[in-house]
């Protein structure tokens, strides 16, 4: 028998827990959001995010690894085509857990787990602009130093000429 994870299990056996999480992940990818208890949602989140990361890779090995968990081929197809395309710009945080009112029958803490579909803020563009500005700053002092050297040479010559000029003026007096 496989050793269970630390802490209480969601079901009576590890196999039942794996099947329950696989079924919830399938429902999540089919519908975009599901309502469940808070502990189940917290256990589902890492699994769902890992499966979406595999889907973003998009290769055959990743598809086979996802098929180990999600047995429904149509859901895997949706995951690899639609959901992975939506999450392409996002680097994690693909799901959101929102607590809702306790369940009516037994007052169990309920939650909604859903896929995050809002577009990602344009932080990548800002980072690229900052990187370009940093490169421009590094190049600017080099160009400025060359320009300074070019302008300093005449100043030194002028100082030498000025030093000679007072000496000539003293001789003239």
Swiss-Prot record:
Is this entry keyworded Lyase? no
Assigned keywords, A-Z: Ribonucleoprotein, Ribosomal protein
The Swiss-Prot or TrEMBL record annotates one GO molecular function as:
structural constituent of ribosome
Q: Which GO terms describe its biological process?
A: translation
**What Gene Ontology cellular component terms go with this record?**
cytosolic large ribosomal subunit
Q: Where is the composition biased (Acidic residues)?
A: 138-149
**Record's compositionally biased regions (Low complexity):** 150-166
Q: Does the keyword DNA repair apply?
A: no
Which PROSITE patterns has this protein been placed in? RIBOSOMAL_L17
Location of the region described as Disordered in the Swiss-Prot/TrEMBL record: 136-173
A Pfam family per the record: Ribosomal_L17
Q: How does it assemble?
A: Part of the 50S ribosomal subunit. Contacts protein L32.
HAMAP family reported for this sequence: Ribosomal_bL17
Record family assignment: Belongs to the bacterial ribosomal protein bL17 family.
Q: What is this protein called?
A: Large ribosomal subunit protein bL17
Organism of provenance: Bifidobacterium longum subsp. infantis (strain ATCC 15697 / DSM 20088 / JCM 1222 / NCTC 11817 / S12)
Q: In the UniProt record, what gene is named as encoding this protein?
A: rplQ
